[in-house]
């Protein structure tokens, strides 16, 4: 007979957990026979005593198997089922371009995304800015969209990795979110439940990253690569910069417009392009759709320049209930803020540093994110034309623009952004891409 308290005692005493015990514990989490207090005690024991790679693999697979696991074989797809996941940040709109780009190159991308968390924007919130777009279709509609279009971006359902949903909710209120072992299992259980052949992980580094230090970001990346591969899914990770907003804008409708501009060739900001291409190229190599990164980049640029990637995005939007002419007339459908004001620089100088987390929180304060789960989002608000590290700005020239619902909210955001920028005599832009793991 399985006794949760004895299982918890093992980890408390730094003893190894076996696969059967982990599976039994996760089954108890799912059926409710393991109490909230026992989940909390287990999470704290793991936080202090950690899990080995084998234990992490076992926990990940048990959480995957706690609900539905999508199987794409019956659809007889003619390409690999692959995806990208990001630890999140500010202005990280990569998913909206990467999915269609990879689909246009022969991949199938069933991307299950999340809402905003803390200062980070959520891909699901961005897509919800598109009128009519259904982020929670039923499984059949999701599978049809992936089969017919090659990409569908939706939200997590209660039937995918339900044990993880319960464990995460308890970790969130028991000061155990920061456990690399449990973050790894949380991310990968959902990705494995989506039936992926391969995954590329985008792990952010810097002031707007989820992990506070570069060392911790690298530790998380290594854990995800080791556990993903240990669970039978080809997995690599790329460490990318989040010391400033990735796109020159932040905010839901504004980022959708940015993604459309990128796909149609109207504007491809350099740092955003570098990260999007690096992740997309690695995904093509992972899925066997390109011989090497150079071959992958050539295929991706062809997909962009021919309009094939933009066409996949348009088809995905239509397949999931959005407007058929969004690519051609985004301004007709995307909400626009009532107030748009510049953020004047308080002095002349070169941007040396940006508090990226503060930029994200400024968007949340404008109404573009949530402080409580039940909060409604104002999709129109955000920031645009943000100055980059290494860029020279003259006094009273704009560091960016605030899009707000009213003048009071705009004034508060202007002050926050001015305080988020540090200007000096000189400043060098940080690398966009730090390293690849796996």
Curated annotation (Swiss-Prot):
PROSITE patterns, A to Z: THYMID_PHOSPHORYLASE (PS00647)
Disulfide bonds: none
InterPro entries linked to this entry: Glycosyl_Trfase_fam3, Glycosyl_Trfase_fam3_N_dom, Glycosyl_Trfase_fam3_N_dom_sf, Nuc_phospho_transferase, PYNP-like_C_sf, PYNP_C, Pyrmidine_PPas_bac/euk, Pyrmidine_PPase_CS
GO-annotated biological processes: pyrimidine nucleobase metabolic process; thymidine metabolic process
One Pfam family this sequence matches: Glycos_trans_3N
GO-annotated cellular components: cytosol
Pathway listed: Pyrimidine metabolism; dTMP biosynthesis via salvage pathway; dTMP from thymine: step 1/2
Enzyme Commission numbers on file: 2.4.2.4
Catalyzed reactions per annotation: thymidine + phosphate = 2-deoxy-alpha-D-ribose 1-phosphate + thymine
One annotated GO molecular function: thymidine phosphorylase activity
NCBIfam families named in the record: PRK05820.1, T_phosphoryl, Y_phosphoryl
Complexes and interactors: Homodimer.
Family to which this protein belongs: Belongs to the thymidine/pyrimidine-nucleoside phosphorylase family.
Name recorded for this polypeptide: Thymidine phosphorylase
Annotated source species: Burkholderia lata (strain ATCC 17760 / DSM 23089 / LMG 22485 / NCIMB 9086 / R18194 / 383)
Higher taxonomy: Bacteria, Pseudomonadati, Pseudomonadota, Betaproteobacteria, Burkholderiales
Name of the coding gene: deoA
